């Protein structure tokens, strides 16, 4: 059973924190550079002899508000919610164990949080901070991503739905969402914490489609262009029994928080923290 987490963090601010005001950290996030036509990138390293990616980034300093110092975020309004969500799984380096045990646990957490009729967990990523080695042969291991993005667009979310439930599946549903459940493997998280952009502050035109090329297929994601009205949040000192649940796509035609772009960031208060280790699963939440 999971619940919305609203307990304040009692940690006292250290001297020398780089903050805009209490509860807000000022940090750099990379955004898609404006004016890039037909941006594309690769899901892994650029293949030998292939064109260089056209997606280019610009860094902006943004204020990132600690959710422990404010009212809890609401999933339908903001596109994200922080859950108090204990896990019984600890062997996150064992991919088979994760698929057999953790996927079902996550499906139950998401279904409980959203009231969905069905939840299909279809893949996951384990991410490690830059100081930890990454096994090159493990496609589920990677570095924290330090640019603002969503994992799906309307087109790629529909393709995923068809892949999981067959052609025309959307015609049998009242609503479907693509969501991520993100949690630390070790805590507290100080290195590369996850920042989420309030979905209600994201203009549609700030979301730009980017072609994501893999050896076997081509997908599509959104990169975010910076705008001054965007509001960013994070949860300080996240523990293993906490998890972010956030939207990458929502088929509902209205609602403020249709998506919640996300990015890792470097917290200037913790430049020498232990490298982050985290796992995120991606899932479809189905409403009949």
Where are these predicted regions, by residue range?
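Intrinsically disordered, low-structural-confidence terminal and linker regions
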Residues: 1-18, 25
């Amino acid at each position: 059973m999971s619940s919305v987490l609203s307990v304040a963090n009692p940690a006292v601010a250290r001297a020398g924190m780089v903050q805009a005001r209490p509860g807000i950290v000022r940090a750099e996030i990379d955004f898609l550079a404006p004016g890039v036509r037909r941006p594309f990138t690769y899901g892994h390293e650029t293949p030998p002899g292939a064109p260089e990616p056209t997606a280019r980034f610009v860094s902006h300093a943004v204020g990132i508000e600690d959710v422990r110092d404010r009212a809890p975020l609401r999933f339908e309004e903001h596109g994200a919610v922080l859950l108090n969500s204990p896990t019984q799984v600890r062997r996150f380096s064992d991919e088979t164990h994760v698929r057999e045990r953790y996927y079902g646990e996550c499906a139950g957490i998401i279904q409980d949080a959203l009231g969905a009729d069905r939840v299909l967990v279809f893949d996951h990523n384990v991410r490690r901070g830059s100081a930890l080695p990454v096994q090159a042969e493990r496609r589920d291991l990677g570095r924290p991503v330090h640019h603002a993005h969503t994992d799906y667009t309307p087109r790629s979310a529909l393709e995923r739905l068809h892949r999981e439930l067959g052609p025309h599946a959307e015609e049998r549903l009242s609503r479907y969402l693509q969501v991520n459940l993100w949690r630390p493997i070790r805590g507290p998280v100080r290195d590369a914490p996850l920042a989420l952009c309030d979905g209600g502050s994201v203009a549609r035109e700030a979301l730009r489609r980017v072609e994501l090329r893999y050896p076997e297929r081509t997908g599509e994601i959104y990169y975010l262009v910076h705008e001054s009205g965007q509001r960013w949040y994070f949860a300080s000192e996240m523990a293993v029994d906490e998890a972010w649940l956030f939207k990458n796509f929502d088929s509902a035609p209205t609602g403020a928080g249709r998506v919640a772009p996300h990015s890792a960031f470097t917290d200037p208060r913790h430049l020498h923290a232990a490298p982050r280790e985290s796992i995120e699963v991606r899932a479809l939440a189905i409403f009949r």
